[in-house]
Amino acid sequence: HYEAQLPFVIYRKPKAESFFSLLQKDDKLHVNNDLSEAGFVFAPFDSNQNIVLIPDSNSLSFEIDLSQGLNVIPTDFASDKTPDLHNRADHIKLVEKGIHAIKRGDLHKVVLSRKESLEGIAWDSFMDIFTRMLSNYPTAFVYVWFHPKVGMWAGATPETLLHLDGNKIQTMSLAGTQLYKEGKI
């Protein structure tokens, strides 16, 4: 699907033994700002930007059992290089800044994450990264999302947005979630 430049998402739910794929049939950019249509939503942090949807109604979907071929995944994804002290120092400063903001009452929760931008990466390399994320983060929601008009994103998050247990729903705030204050966004 990537070679044909058609939108798709591949994801695994936390602790799941299978992963899912949703393959859009065309390259149309579907926007669904009112969340009225079923599919996989990719929403930006900026609420002024459009919510992109890979719609169920215009996609093929598959579930793949991880024991059927991806059970032997390399676990040596972590680099054995010496950590870059400059990046480590920047990270420590960022943690300290977050702690001070919490103590001042400006923030109640801070989540630091790593970001890497890769340009010109081959599809085989990206699938290798995805399979390593599956192995290294078994309790996380792991995904690769692609749209030729938006780009490719991959990630792993341990946070649960919504958990359904019978008729009981539990939720928690995710990174970036802030308390609503009248007149402030």
Where do the language-model regions lie?
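Short, structured patches in soluble enzyme cores that scaffold and shape functional sites
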Residues: 45, 114-116, 145-149, 156-158, ...
